[in-house]
């Protein structure tokens, strides 16, 4: 690449450690933290290690988590042995919320990428669909995580979105309401009473 045009920076995506990551001018990490290894909270630890030991690299990051809108209920972050069959939308939503929280505190990364905007067909998946997109395979239904990035990245159109509206069955008397807003602090009311809100991350 350098022989063809020395003026253009080279870039690569890596899920490995080691000297391999020193080859290109730019590196985009695809470590899948909180997806196929560890928990999303471990992203904060990894970013700290990146700053202390690899800060000479020009680093970006890409990430994603599967979520099927037909699967609602337990949004638990810990992955199960049958996770290819059980991919609740709520778990994908929380995954992206956590990444938003930790990446907002970081100044080292030069770029952020979501793995894919749309779900796509895959013979490797039991349902025949790779569901890491923010929009369904038919391009008609937007998942909650789509609205998160619209609130974060769309500066021309204000966003106000309540998550979890497809969760028809809920357990317990205490419920959490999550709102994405780029239109100012939302006001949440219940039976005429205004509820206290707490910011979890930018726009959340």
Feature-to-residue mapping (PLM):
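Exposed aromatic-hydrophobic patches
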Residues: 204
């Amino acid at each position: 690449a350098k022989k063809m045009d020395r003026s253009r920076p080279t870039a690569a995506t890596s899920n490995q450690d080691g000297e391999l990551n020193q080859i290109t001018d730019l590196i985009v990490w695809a470590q899948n933290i909180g997806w196929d290894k560890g928990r999303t909270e471990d992203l904060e630890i990894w970013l700290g290690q990146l700053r202390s030991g690899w800060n000479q690299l020009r680093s970006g990051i890409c990430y994603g988590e599967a979520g099927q809108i037909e699967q609602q209920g337990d949004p638990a972050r810990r992955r199960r042995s049958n996770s290819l069959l059980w991919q609740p939308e709520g778990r994908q939503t929380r995954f992206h919320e956590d990444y938003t929280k930790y990446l907002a505190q970081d100044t080292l990364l030069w770029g952020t990428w979501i793995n894919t905007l749309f779900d796509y067909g895959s013979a490797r998946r039991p349902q025949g669909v790779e569901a890491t997109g923010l929009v369904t395979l038919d391009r008609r239904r937007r998942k909650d995580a789509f609205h998160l990035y619209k609130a974060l990245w769309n500066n021309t159109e204000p966003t106000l979105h309540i998550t979890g509206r497809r969760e028809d069955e809920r357990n317990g008397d205490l419920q959490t309401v999550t709102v994405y807003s780029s239109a100012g602090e939302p006001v949440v009311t219940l039976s005429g009473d205004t509820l206290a809100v707490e910011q979890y991350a930018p726009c959340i």
